[in-house]
Amino acid sequence: MAQSTVYKPAKPIDKNLDSKLIEKAYSFAVECHKSQKRHSGDPYISHPVAVADILLNLKLDTSTIITGLLHDTLEDTLATENEIEEKFGKEVLQLVNGVTKLSKIETYTENKFQAENFRKLILAMSKDIRVLLVKLADRLHNMRTIQFIPQEKRRQRIASETLEIYAPLAGRLGMHEFKDELEDLSFQILNPSAYSSLMTRIEYLKKDKSNLTDKIKTRIFSLLEKNEIDCQIIGREKKIFSVWNKMQNKQIAFRQLSDIFAYRIITNSIEDCYSILGIIHNRWSAVPGSFKDYISVSYTHLTLPTIYSV
């Protein structure tokens, strides 16, 4: 199948980016990878394009998008450093080199202490944070397509490495959607029966409770609107690995979990946070021991998590 010579990203390229240079990088990557295939049988270029699309969604700069397109060229093709610097500049070369060096680190370990050391090593090697962002995007797409790797042991090794090294790194960077997806994709490989069982239960609950969760959200919004509090209410569904992790850590059954579905109420000030807490406390009964004040203790995230009986 002939590969298109025109870059077609999943979303339009932002007008602030250098679309011509990105197109040039795409054409160069197509030429470099032209004889290579993925385990799925797709042309290899489909992978760097997917990585670049992920980076575009993060609204990153031109050099980072180009690095996404070229991140495997030095390691897996005949492309040279001189070529990349000549065509795309020193900054891109440094980024591609950084990603290549990270890819060469053997990070698989079952030892928690070693895993933490590997995470520190990766952070230390990523002098430019964009190197780590490209690597995380690379790992995310590889995990999305991991089912095409024929060797089960290799799939499990990659999944373990992802769970122990890359998912926690994404969390440290505040990339919680990345973290959640990497964890669930890894868990699906490492414990498929538990993953399938929990997914079935959560899907059933979603259908069974959908009307109730919508009503609760409407009630909360109406209550806060009456009190003239400007806020945003976002529904949150606990991810499968997070559910499993909580069940294991607390030694509880699925039916004992109280936070599979929750709401985030986002407001403009700390004062409003406490006002909202008081308003909702007056409407519903809080579950004893569930309230935590992460504002007064200067936690990373300024939140007031609480569980209510509705």
Where are these regions (language model features)?
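Active-site helical microenvironments for divalent-metal-assisted chemistry
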Residues: 1-302
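Single conserved hydrophobic/aromatic residue that forms the stacking wall/gate
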Residues: 301-310
